[in-house]
């Protein structure tokens, strides 16, 4: 009989609850290692030696993943979901913009988790001043953990230096929850993990600035300004880190062609972990139809391929993010993004509030 890789009693007490929600690989590792123990016969392995071995593996996974992971979800189609990153981007175009995205994590793994995003924003004009409002809902689930965010956003848009300067702010309600009643850790009395369902909420805030010129754009935002600590019961807590991000891009229109090259980048830093997404897209646009494809490279994280298009105001795109570390290429993320734009006649008729240089 093969040795049983049992970690039912590994020192999970050393793993702080605040780190658990993002340790996706650890979750699957624990589940895979615990399962064989349920059918193992006594004496089939040396418990003490195995405990030390498994404990080292688990703690190594904890340290590695915590050092590399950020708390907020990373969408592959970040240029389509800019309000998720920066409140200054709401109301930048004269249409009502509706966007939704679904990301499935850890392909091939049971309970790999998913992230859902839904948002809408619109522009309006008061006198000669231009404004934007929006709202988003986001639900990030992984195993027994759930992270929800509801935000209302406002932006002020000002013509400046031949482009548009936008300043935005948002108010957030964060909710963290864990289904402790569904946990199967072998030891029902283990105090390291809650045995009942717990949840907690806290208010938060974010701010951002964004500048768009004819062919290029750039934005900077600070999220989770209050860095709240969400309490779940009396003994568990989840500490939210401040997150700073920069987004920028340039549209290069090829001469005598329907093609545009649109490089862009997204940089994120939360005080301990840094992530850079470097994207190259090729767009074909003709007779109100737009098709695009491209690649994103995130050093030490992943490579993403995507394809999509726009038809009569409806945007549909798909991507697959292959991990270059951790669980490997086959355990990546599938993502589908859907968008819709509806023309609104607010403010002065016949005049667009401002044009967007961002290609969806």
Show which residues each predicted segment covers:
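Cleavable N-terminal export/targeting peptides
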Residues: 1-72, 343-360
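Subset of outer-membrane beta-barrel
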Residues: 70-360
């Amino acid at each position: 009989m093969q040795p049983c890789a049992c970690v039912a009693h590994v020192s999970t007490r050393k793993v702080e609850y605040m780190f658990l929600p993002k340790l996706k690989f650890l979750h699957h590792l624990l589940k895979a290692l615990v399962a064989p123990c349920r059918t193992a016969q006594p004496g089939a392995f040396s418990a003490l030696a195995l405990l030390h071995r498994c404990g080292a593996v688990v703690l190594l996974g904890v340290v590695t993943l915590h050092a590399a992971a950020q708390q907020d979800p990373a969408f592959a189609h970040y240029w389509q979901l800019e309000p998720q990153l920066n409140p200054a981007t709401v109301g930048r175009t004269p249409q009502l913009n509706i966007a939704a995205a679904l990301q499935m994590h850890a392909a091939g793994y049971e309970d790999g988790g998913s992230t859902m995003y839904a948002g809408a924003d619109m522009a309006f004009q008061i006198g000669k001043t231009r404004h934007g409002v929006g709202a988003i809902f986001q639900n990030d689930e992984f195993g027994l953990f759930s992270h929800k965010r509801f935000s209302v956003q406002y932006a002020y848009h000002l013509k400046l230096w031949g482009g548009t300067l936008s300043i935005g702010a948002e108010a957030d309600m964060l909710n963290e929850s864990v289904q402790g009643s569904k946990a199967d850790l072998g030891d029902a009395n283990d105090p390291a993990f809650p045995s009942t369902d717990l949840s907690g909420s806290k208010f938060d805030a974010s701010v951002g600035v964004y500048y768009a010129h004819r062919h290029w754009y750039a934005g900077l935002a600070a999220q989770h300004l209050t860095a709240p600590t969400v309490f779940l019961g009396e003994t568990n807590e989840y500490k939210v880190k401040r997150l700073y991000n920069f987004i920028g891009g340039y549209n290069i229109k090829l001469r005598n062609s329907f093609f545009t090259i649109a490089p862009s980048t997204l940089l994120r830093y939360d005080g301990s972990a840094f992530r850079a997404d470097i994207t190259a897209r090729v767009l074909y646009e003709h007779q109100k139809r737009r098709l695009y494809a491209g690649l994103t490279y995130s050093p030490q994280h992943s490579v993403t391929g995507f394809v999509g298009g726009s038809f009569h105001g409806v945007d549909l795109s798909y991507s697959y993010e292959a991990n270059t570390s951790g669980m490997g290429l086959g355990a990546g993320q599938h993502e589908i993004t859907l968008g819709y734009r509806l023309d609104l006649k607010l403010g002065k008729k016949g005049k667009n509030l401002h044009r967007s240089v961002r290609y969806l």
